[in-house]
């Protein structure tokens, strides 16, 4: 009788684990790899502000990082929605009234339609020569690039090395506390 009891306990634990796993997958929010890409149209027709997610090449991986697709698509969508709620910025919307948030390769011509480019987890970036050229062109034409999600010194150095290739004549430096940009709208 003792072995039968042990078998029932093991079977019960296995069923509980399987049910918990199935339930967790049912409510899982997909993000990052596996999410459908929202590629931009040939031209942005509604004239509203939009944000584009920068797709770039990576030459290494980090634990819990997904390269360009980190936080995709929810971080960008949230940023756009909050921009429209907290400012007078009119954002680009699709036919259903949802925010247009595009995914763009650095090699796509649509890059130059993006006023605001977001790069996530850029500590894994490893740009191909054409990506270096295109990102340089984008930035020199006045494009705005926001990058985030660095994980340590190695990630920062990886990003800084990439930017030294893209804009060698513009070194990265800390903005001093008395710089005018810190008092443009609010004192920081």
Give names to the regions the model predicted:
Residues 23-116, 120-123:
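Aromatic-Pro/Gly-enriched surface loop or interdomain linker
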Residues 26, 31-35, 59-63, 154-188:
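An acidic, glycine-rich "communication" segment
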Residues 51, 111-156:
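Short alpha-beta junction capping motif
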Residues 74-78, 82, 130, 134, ...:
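Extracytoplasmic/secreted proteins, especially bacterial periplasmic and envelope-associated proteins
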